[in-house]
Design a protein with these regions (language model features):
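C-terminal structural segment of proteins
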Residues: 1-144
């Protein structure tokens, strides 16, 4: 996988109703890239798992977000849009309807987590830069 661009963050969430080694009932991955102002979405990728015969890109949800300002409502709308491409089957993990509803929730949460990761990385970078700027070389004293 390529290294994420500056102002980017990603997240992968999965719902495991039983054990950690079980297959996911629903999963969603999101990679979010902000513009230089860090107020608008420059690019986004959303992938869904366990709700179709293969992993699914939610391209319509991605298009909905590109160029939009960062708002919780936009993430919720993208989750709703992503539900349109999900084609889950009912099984012992849940009904098709339940899984489709979970897609909306997990896409929204993955986008929120990706944004939180961007902000956390920015704070860590700022703290590292501050710490580096504060360090001053120690001058050796004269020997007597």
């Amino acid at each position: 996988m390529p290294k994420l661009a500056a102002n980017s963050g990603g997240a992968y969430l999965k719902f495991l109703p039983r054990t950690a080694d079980d297959y996911a009932t629903v999963s969603a991955a999101a990679v979010l890239t902000l513009d230089k102002t860090k107020k608008n979405i420059a690019d986004v990728r959303i992938a869904l798992g366990s709700v179709g015969t293969t992993p699914i890109r939610a391209t319509a949800a991605e298009a909905l977000l590109r160029g939009q300002p960062l708002k919780a409502e936009a993430f919720a709308e993208a989750g709703e849009k992503a539900k349109e491409v999900a084609d889950p089957v009912s099984d012992f993990r849940g009904s098709a309807g339940y899984k489709k509803e979970m897609v909306g929730v997990f896409v929204r949460r993955a986008l929120e987590k990706a944004l939180a990761n961007i902000r956390q990385q920015a704070k860590a970078s700022a703290a590292k830069a501050t710490k580096k700027a504060v360090k001053k070389p120690i001058k050796k004293g004269k020997k007597r």
